[in-house]
A protein has these predicted regions:
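Hydrophobic beta-strand scaffold residues
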Residues: 68, 127, 134-135, 194
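Active-site proximal loops enriched in glycine and acidic residues that flank catalytic Cys/His/Asp
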Residues: 138, 168, 198-200, 225
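Alpha/beta catalytic barrel-like cores
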Residues: 1-109, 160, 192-193, 204-220, ...
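Aromatic-lined carbohydrate-recognition surfaces of secreted/lumenal glycan-active proteins
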Residues: 135-143, 195-196, 261-268
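Alpha/beta enzyme core
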Residues: 24-39, 86-101, 112-124, 129-133, ...
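Short strand-loop junctions, especially beta-strand C-caps/beta-turns
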Residues: 104-108, 169, 199
């Protein structure tokens, strides 16, 4: 699955590649990714920060084999900075044709832990009310990162989302067997299927990181930067998406097919 729900972080990345990062350029990039990568993905995660029409066009652009996931997180993020906190947009209406909703949660070992659990519960309930799947994405902020990843999975996985989206242990750069070992710890505390994200992982390390995560119990990946970062410098990313991102996505899909845990196994466990 491909993530294309980056907002101010995408604006920053485009600006770093020399572009005037207007809302229109962000919209064009998101829809180019949907159009070119959708046929090779099982899912596309997108946001409607820059207009509901972006989601509607993305739904029309991808084939039926690619489900569209909508981010319903409101991000507390200053330009050029990381996301500090999130809240849930408990919307009453959704575009037709959505497969799932997604919520980013910034996990910290602080006095707001119970508050974040409650927000996650409300998110899962929101998706259920709308008859779509729920994808929960905790990102930890803690000096003991590997401990925090497992602790967040234990705490927030208990809200039982349809799918849990998790950071790769060791930033994907460690020994594959060690990464797989950490992933088995994550798998042991989660009651639902889970996948890894690519934020914080060098794109060159991501294929081996996905394989290690799958050996540790993951069912795949939901990644953006590792797939399309190489296209950011182009005024029109279409050709690079076809020449660079499609083969990269196909490589990752082959790894998941070979090593990923079928999501139904974990869902039924």
């Amino acid at each position: 699955m491909v993530a294309m729900d980056q907002r101010e972080s995408l604006r920053t990345m485009l600006a770093e590649h020399g572009h005037e990062a207007t809302d229109e350029r962000l919209r064009r990039f998101k829809l180019a990714v949907a159009r070119e990568l959708g046929p090779y993905a099982s899912g596309l995660l997108i946001d409607d920060e820059y207009g509901a029409e972006v989601v509607e066009e993305a739904i029309r652009a991808v084939p039926p084999s690619c489900g569209v996931l909508l981010a319903v997180d409101v991000l507390d993020q200053q330009p050029g900075q990381i996301v500090e906190e999130t809240s849930l947009d408990e919307r009453e209406a959704l575009p037709e044709g959505l497969a799932a909703l997604k919520l980013l949660v910034i996990w910290r070992d602080d006095e707001r832990r119970a508050e974040r659990v409650e927000m996650s519960r409300r998110f899962v309930a929101l998706a259920e009310r709308h008859g779509v799947l729920s994808v929960l994405e905790p990102v930890v902020r803690h000096e003991r990162r590997e401990w925090a990843i497992v602790e967040a999975a234990r705490e927030l996985g208990a809200t039982r989302p349809s799918l849990y989206k998790c950071q790769v242990p060791l930033g994907g750069a460690g020994d594959p067997d060690e990464i797989a070992g950490h992933c088995r710890e994550i798998d042991a505390v989660l009651p639902c299927p889970w996948v890894v994200l690519s934020q914080g992982v060098d794109p060159a390390d991501f294929p081996s990181a996905v394989e290690a995560a799958c050996r540790g119990g993951a069912s795949g990946m939901l990644a953006g930067r590792a797939v399309w970062t190489a296209t950011l410098g182009a005024d029109d990313p279409t050709q690079l998406l076809r020449e660079v991102s499609v083969p990269r996505l196909q490589e990752l899909a082959a790894i998941v097919d070979a090593h990923g845990r079928p999501w139904r196994e974990k869902a039924a466990a």
